[in-house]
Amino acid sequence: RNAVHERFTEAMNANDLAGLRQIILDCEIACPISGTRNWTEVRQFNLMFSTQMGSTAEGASTIYLRPETAQGIFVNFLNVQKTGRMKLPFGIAQIGKAFRNEIVARQFIFRMREFEQMEMQFFVRPGTEMEWWNRWKETRMAWHRALGFGDDNYRFHDHEKLAHYANAATDIEYNFPFGFKEVEGIHSRTDFDLGNHQKFSGKKIQYFDPETGESYVPYVVETSIGVDRMFLQVMSAAYTEEQLEGGDSRVVLRLPAALAPVKVAILPLVKKDGMPEVAQKIVDELKYDYNVVYDEKDSVGKRYRRQDAIGTPFCVTVDGQTLEDGTVTVRHRDSMQQERVKIETLHALVDQECSYRKLFRKLNL
């Protein structure tokens, strides 16, 4: 077995396709499903999308769509560092499209040819990368757990086989209804990217460290989230079908309040007696700070159900008592409990529950 492994490694490193095929034939490797040994020739697959750029076919140039968003950060490292007067360690983050020419696009959104990435490249002094890699591992796990979908639903999966650019790598996996799948990767990329950009461009991409008096190519710790996977994680965790007393049921999207697209629904109990006008004034008070909807159609019960289904944390009902004492009924999405509050306290209530401050305080940063 060791001899075969050595042959395989040598053939892979030498890009010896004929040698790889000979190993398959010598070992009489069979397909585990069909049992056939009728293999095709060993071929190279290009996992980057190529296209043509140019106004005419004759003058067109071949270009490639980016397989990751990270390289734009590396190319602009010095620009950002100098204009921002940044000192190491610091990070540059972005979100954008990436493209992979997947051999077989499947596994729902886990193998797509076009997808959205959120990435951060964190630049550190060489020799400190493992300390920062471990710190970012814990920070990123804390961020995911702060969403409130259950600490036990997350785990680390450390890589046994590392990519050519990494000296450490781990994935954060979430327990989807169909099992654990990766949602984020944390990698120590060493100086591979900046070093190669410097090598092939012929331009210095180095940082002068005022503490040590040295110039060097920084090492990089990367965090990378698949936005599509993250969206699926949030939706699968939040979606709930509940059976209520009396035989009724409801669909509720238990989104973290900070992530809910609509924070508050303002509902006049009836479309008369001045209630719509008061409700609209409340909308005007809140709409500059939060995404607020106004809904006056159907019974208030049906309106509650509509807001539950899209994850709105609060429904505010304007009724006859509102006209008398300036109070409204606030209904909480998850518990369906209601409380009476003054109109002037609504902003503070929504801010306390829906602000990202509440989410980030859980990280203890």
Task: List PLM regions with ranges.
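NTP/phosphate- and nucleic-acid-binding module
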Residues: 1-365
